[in-house]
């Protein structure tokens, strides 16, 4: 049975086409991975099927009475609510039925016999619905999902406005899972999850009976939970049965076959054109030349899609710093309350360190404290000599209305326009991207702009806060290669062991330093 039908979808932004005559069908119980490079339109597709964005052309049709739940990259939480209130709001329809049930019970004492029958019938119907949906186990369900995603550690009575980006994503994901929609639409749900919570979500999705569409650049995660791949490329959407690895195998074969057919056809076209040119003037061969020309005119010419630029990151190494890079003296980090015990550690030249630990434990706070962007609650940070620091922030707040060209030019005013364009293109951005405002780019494209600023600056130490979030597979592989080759030191926050294990020579677990009880 088809849950969602998308027919002849066409959409673009200005003169930049995203889809061209795309069709899509979601069947009951399908577990779909929606894949493609940054900027191909995956999040735009999700916005269109959920009605947040109207397509230029085409039709989106949901089956009747289907409840879709959507977690997008930029979802927000309502101010003033606690974590517990947000999670419990997943059951609002049932809570309203309970209110109605209580109203009926209050009226039964004064109802006349005629009214009594109707009220009793309605009461029975509501009680059956509440029982069917395990209404009386709501608190247990909330606690189960909150524990699985690490939200109990934050306290359910905590205001959502106090949460980090990763914590907010967890709350929204937990609420969505508690709603148990007929279809889950998940846009990069693992970006802000820790390893243990990714493992839990993996188990949850494996057991999920309903359908889901998942956007993710986390290939091991994708491989473990999906059975259908939809690949978005060059304004097309193509379906492949199987996991991501199987898709790659089939895609590579199809691409090789198409390229071989293209070369063969181009050879034939060249020979036909040559024959026509040599023989059309002669009376004796004119008919044969005309026949060849007709064949050329009727030929369905194979076109190869233009190759997308692959990013190339190469970090510039500046002058050699002193042996000591950072040294802390009884450093206590935090905002209103301490997040750490007094810290006494030294980071030295040549170290490449992964900083790990659950969300909210203080990893970002530590980075910002080392940089002097946050004042410590007590203690001090000593920075070494000749430091040239490159810092990649996890979240950049505000809506950036500058174009990519302007963004880079502000950072490097001495660059010529050619140098600016070349630098952005080298990081995997097309001409259309380069001339667009930063705010209209996908999360991955925005990350590439920020990385572009970083690789064009001399540094001798990189502080990177979740740099792989939103990056597509090619960009992630290239970033890993660049970090392995980088001659400087690295302090890296990352939730993907398969990324950082090949980059770092040490792993620091912040759970050893935290004041939090887990």
Residue ranges and their predicted role:
Residues 1-260, 309, 318-518:
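ABC ATP-binding cassette signature C-motif
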Residues 250-305:
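Intracellular alpha-helical coupling/juxtamembrane segments of multi-pass membrane proteins
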Residues 313-315:
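Post-kinase regulatory C-tail/linker adjacent to protein kinase catalytic domains
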């Amino acid at each position: 049975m088809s849950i969602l039908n998308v027919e002849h979808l066409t959409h673009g932004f200005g003169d930049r086409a995203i889809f061209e005559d795309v069709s899509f069908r979601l069947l009951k119980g399908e577990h779909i991975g929606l894949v493609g490079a940054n900027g191909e339109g995956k999040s735009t597709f999700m916005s269109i099927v959920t009605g947040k964005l109207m397509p230029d052309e085409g039709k989106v049709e949901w089956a009747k009475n289907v409840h879709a739940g959507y977690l997008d990259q930029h979802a927000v939480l309502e101010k003033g609510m606690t974590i517990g209130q947000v999670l419990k709001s997943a059951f609002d329809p049932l809570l309203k039925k309970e209110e109605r049930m209580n109203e009926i019970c209050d009226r039964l004492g004064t109802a006349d016999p005629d009214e009594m029958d109707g009220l009793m019938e309605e009461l029975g119907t509501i009680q059956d619905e509440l029982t069917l949906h395990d209404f009386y186990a709501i608190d247990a369900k909330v606690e189960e999902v909150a524990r699985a995603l690490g939200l109990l550690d934050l306290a359910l009575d905590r205001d959502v406005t106090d949460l980090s980006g990763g914590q907010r994503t967890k709350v929204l994901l937990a609420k969505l899972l508690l709603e148990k929609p007929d279809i889950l639409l998940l846009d990069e749900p693992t970006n802000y999850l820790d390893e243990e919570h990714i493992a839990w979500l993996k188990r949850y999705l494996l057991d999920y009976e309903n359908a889901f569409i998942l956007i993710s650049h986390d290939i091991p995660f994708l491989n473990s939970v999906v059975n259908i791949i939809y690949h978005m490329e060059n304004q097309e959407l193509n379906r492949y049965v199987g996991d991501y690895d199987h898709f790659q195998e089939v895609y590579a074969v199809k691409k090789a076959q198409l390229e071989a057919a293209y070369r063969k056809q181009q050879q034939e076209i060249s020979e036909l054109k040559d024959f026509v040119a040599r023989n059309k003037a002669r009376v004796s061969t004119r008919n044969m030349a005309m026949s060849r020309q007709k064949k050329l005119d009727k030929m369905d010419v194979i076109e190869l899609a233009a190759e997308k630029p692959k990013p190339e990151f190469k970090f510039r190494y500046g002058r050699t710093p002193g042996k000591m890079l950072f040294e802390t003296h009884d450093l206590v980090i935090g905002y209103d309350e301490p997040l750490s015990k007094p810290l006494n550690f030294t980071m030295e030249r040549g170290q490449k360190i992964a900083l790990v630990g659950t969300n909210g434990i203080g990893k970002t706070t530590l980075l910002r404290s080392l940089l002097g962007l946050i004042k410590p609650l007590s203690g001090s940070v000593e920075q070494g000599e000749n430091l040239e620091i490159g810092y990649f922030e996890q979240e950049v707040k505000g809506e950036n209305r500058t174009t990519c060209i302007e963004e880079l030019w502000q950072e490097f005013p001495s660059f010529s326009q050619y140098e600016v364009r070349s630098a952005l293109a080298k990081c995997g951005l097309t001409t259309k991207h380069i001339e667009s405002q930063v705010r209209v780019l996908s999360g991955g494209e925005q990350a590439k702009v920020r990385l572009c600023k970083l690789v064009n600056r001399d540094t001798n130490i990189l502080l990177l806060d979740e740099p792989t979030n939103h990056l597509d597979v090619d960009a992630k592989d290239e970033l890993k290669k660049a970090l392995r080759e980088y001659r400087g030191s690295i302090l890296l926050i990352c939730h993907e062991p398969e990324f950082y294990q090949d980059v770092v020579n040490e792993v620091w677990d912040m759970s050893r330093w935290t004041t939090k009880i887990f």
